[in-house]
Amino acid sequence: MSTPYYPHPIIAREGWPFIAGAFAVALLVQFMAGWLWALPFWLIALFVLQFFRDPPRVVPALAGAVLAPADGRIVAVDKVQDPYLPREALKVSVFMNVFNVHSNRSPVDGEIRNRWYFPGNFLNASLPKASLENERNALWIRTDGGQDVTCVQIAGLIAKRIVCHVHPGEHLARGQRFGFIRFGSRVDVYLPLGTKVNVAIGDKVYATQTVLAEFH
C-alpha cells in the first residue's frame, strides 16, 4: 500500500462558499434572535461542513486494479452498451448519498482521451435511467496497459453541480482526485468485457481504497 502526496485541504475547496454561507446565516440568526432560534441553522452548517470533507486515501499497490471512484453503495453491475464508446462493456455504478464523501478519484492510471458534458435532468441518481437522462460528465481514460475505461459523474436529485478539473491529454494516477459532485450523486464506470468484477449490488465501497475490479 502507498500513500501518495495529497495536495488538497481536508475540507474540499468546492464547498468553501457553501460552508461560509451556512455559518454566516447561523451567526446572523444567533445575533438577531438568540441561540435557541439559531440551533437548527448551526446543525445545518455542521452538516454542510461534514459533507465537504475530503480525506486522503491509501492507494492499493495491486497491478491491474480498478479502484472505486467514489464512496457509496453499488447499485448496478451490468453488461451494457457503452454510451460513450462503440463497444459492449461492464458497468459498475456507485451511488453516493448525502452522508458519503463526494470527492471523485480516478479508478485507473491512464491518459484522458476525451471528455463529454451533457446537461440533463435531476432524477434520483440511484435509478437506472439516471445514467442516460441526468446531467453528467464523462471521461474516456486509456490506461497505461491499453484498456479503455469510461468514468461518468452523474448529478442526482439534490445535486445540481458537477465539478471536473481535468481535460483531454492529461494523465491521471489511480486515486488522483479529479472532481466533485455537490449534494448526492452517482458515478458509473464502464470496463472492458472480461474484466473481473470484485463487487456486487448492495456492497459499500470507499473511493480509492476499494478494488472494484481487476484487469486480466
Swiss-Prot record:
Name its cellular compartments: Cell membrane
Q: What Enzyme Commission number does this protein have?
A: 4.1.1.65
Task: Tell me what topology the record assigns in the membrane.
Answer: Peripheral membrane protein
Catalytic residues in the record = 185
Q: Which residues carry this modification: Pyruvic acid (Ser)?
A: 185
- Site Cleavage (non-hydrolytic): list residues: 184-185
Q: Which GO terms describe its molecular function?
A: phosphatidylserine decarboxylase activity
UniProt keyword Ion transport, yes or no = no
Extract one GO cellular component term from the record: plasma membrane
GO biological process terms on file: phosphatidylethanolamine biosynthetic process
Q: Which reaction does it catalyse?
A: a 1,2-diacyl-sn-glycero-3-phospho-L-serine + H(+) = a 1,2-diacyl-sn-glycero-3-phosphoethanolamine + CO2
Would the keyword Oxidoreductase be found if you checked this record's keyword annotation? no
Q: What does the record say about PTM?
A: Is synthesized initially as an inactive proenzyme. Formation of the active enzyme involves a self-maturation process in which the active site pyruvoyl group is generated from an internal serine residue via an autocatalytic post-translational modification. Two non-identical subunits are generated from the proenzyme in this reaction, and the pyruvate is formed at the N-terminus of the alpha chain, which is derived from the carboxyl end of the proenzyme.
**Key words, A-Z:** Cell membrane, Decarboxylase, Lipid biosynthesis, Lipid metabolism, Lyase, Membrane, Phospholipid biosynthesis, Phospholipid metabolism, Pyruvate, Zymogen
What binding details are noted for the cofactor? Binds 1 pyruvoyl group covalently per subunit.
Q: What is its main location?
A: membrane
| Cofactor field | pyruvate
> What enzyme category does the UniProt record give?
lyase
Pfam families associated with the record = PS_Dcarbxylase (PF02666)
This protein's pathway: Phospholipid metabolism; phosphatidylethanolamine biosynthesis; phosphatidylethanolamine from CDP-diacylglycerol: step 2/2
Please name the NCBIfam families in this protein's record: PRK05305.1-2, PRK05305.1-5
Briefly, what is this protein's role?
A: Catalyzes the formation of phosphatidylethanolamine (PtdEtn) from phosphatidylserine (PtdSer).
Family membership noted in the UniProt record: Belongs to the phosphatidylserine decarboxylase family. PSD-A subfamily.
State whether it acts alone or in a complex, and with which partners, per the record. Answer: Heterodimer of a large membrane-associated beta subunit and a small pyruvoyl-containing alpha subunit.
Matching entries from PANTHER family are given as: ARCHAETIDYLSERINE DECARBOXYLASE PROENZYME-RELATED
Q: What is this protein called?
A: Phosphatidylserine decarboxylase proenzyme
Source species of the chain: Nitrosomonas europaea (strain ATCC 19718 / CIP 103999 / KCTC 2705 / NBRC 14298)
